[in-house]
Amino acid sequence: MKKSKWMLGAAALLALSVTVAGCGGDDKKADSGKGGLSGEVMVYTSIYPDIIDNMCKPNVAKAFPDMKVNWFQGGTEKVITKITGEIKAKKIAADALMVADPSYYLKLDEQKLLLPYVSPEAKNVISEKDKEGAWTAVRISNMIIAYNSDKLKPEDAPKTWEELTDPKWKGKIAMPNPMLSGTAYVAVGALADKYGWEYFDKLKANGIRVEEGNSAIQNKLLTGEYAAAMILEENILKLANTKNEPLKVSYPEDGVVMVPSPIAIFNTTKNPEGAKALVDWWLSKEGQEAVVKGWMHSVRGDVPAPKGAPETKKLVEGANKVDWKKLADNNAEIKEE
């Protein structure tokens, strides 16, 4: 399925993953039993650094005062590359994983690397989850179409994914690089399933630009370099609500591409009880409210959507179906497309 290499010509990866939160020693203690949860838990995640720093760290520290939670943060593909290397070396440092590519969890489960755990909070989850507890969605991101309302009237903005192939948008549209972005990778797979690979041939012919990530796209939407773009809903909601920027979301009539980001525990963890408690926290109302404060959607049905977004249940009902098994089995081919 190597029809072209155009996505490989995108901007080089600039942002480096960094380790955030406490350093501390390498040894991880198990649960201290009667004394409560203790030791350390290492989480590898693609969730945004500001959410970790401003919401996760203080709330998790309050919930687990005797347990140290460390966070390794990077883009989904960067985190996957790191953990894949550790798996090959048989030195998995992570206790838990949170990245925006459910298909990768299927691979990990097939390799029998995950510790099944059905959280008591899982009954409230309306998003996707493994019935055996290998992984459970913890946040929802949506790939949508965005535009600058200072440059484009709402009635003139693209209303469907197919409209992006219209010649009137030639050279004025963009998308994130699926080689670097897990959500963009999922969007490529979902839209190829819906419209065929010819859809991306048409986008290429229409001069679509492939950017390093969502931040570069939103900046160029603001300057007017792009008229419209595939981008994460959360980026646009944050700018519109916190900085009063004129960026708007056009929710495609042919469905958003919904990307649940699961959490899973590696069966190599030295602190399984601590890792399970962290899963419980993320799936709790408190943890999910932190997700929504980061402008993403909660996986729970009883937590409202972020400001300016439709209710999550409505988006779930109309979202494009994603074949996670197909994505897992055809990872290299999809990225080379």
Each predicted region: which residue ranges?
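Periplasmic-binding protein-like
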Residues: I52, S141, G171-M179, K202-L203, V210-E211, E245-N267, W281-D302, ...
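A bilobed periplasmic-binding-protein/Venus flytrap-type ligand-binding module shared by bacterial periplasmic
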Residues: A146-K151, G189, V259-P272, W282, ...
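A ligand-binding cleft/hinge motif common to bilobed small-molecule-binding domains
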Residues: S103-K107, A227-P246
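C-terminal capping/gating helix-and-loop segments adjacent to ligand/active sites or protein-protein/ligand interfaces
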Residues: E289-E337
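Short, low-complexity disordered leader/linker segments with a strong preference
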Residues: M1-E40
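Short, polar/charged alpha-helical segment
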Residues: L37, M42-N70, K78, I145, ...
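Extracytoplasmic ligand-binding site segments that recognize negatively charged/polar headgroups
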Residues: T45-N54, F72, T76-E77, I92-Y226
